């Protein structure tokens, strides 16, 4: 059953990217990348992880815009993916990209310090 949830999540990820970039006209929604979609085993709840280009204010405005368009997005998903019931959607920021960048920066600093000591 977990395999089906993963397949639905991947399909939703692809469709959400298209819907957010082409169908949503809210000016608060800026450049958004859907990084992952986690769907519950019973296919009732979908958590959408997004990455937003911009500062904290832009991120918050984007989240508000997506929350406002949640019903429209869910209906579009329902039309594009054949399921008995379209999952309830919630949006969250994907912090893993920021963590990865921070780790990369730290590794570069360690590497520079190691070269200086030699």
UniProtKB/Swiss-Prot annotation:
It is found in: Cytoplasm. Coiled coil: none annotated. Keywords: Cytoplasm, Ribosome biogenesis. Pfam families: RBFA (PF02033). Disulfide bonds: none annotated. One of its GO terms (cellular component) is cytosol. GO terms for biological process: maturation of SSU-rRNA. GO terms for molecular function: ribosomal small subunit binding. PANTHER family: RIBOSOME-BINDING FACTOR A, CHLOROPLASTIC-RELATED. Belongs to the RbfA family. Monomer. Binds 30S ribosomal subunits, but not 50S ribosomal subunits or 70S ribosomes. One of several proteins that assist in the late maturation steps of the functional core of the 30S ribosomal subunit. Associates with free 30S ribosomal subunits (but not with 30S subunits that are part of 70S ribosomes or polysomes). Required for efficient processing of 16S rRNA. May interact with the 5'-terminal helix region of 16S rRNA. This is Ribosome-binding factor A.
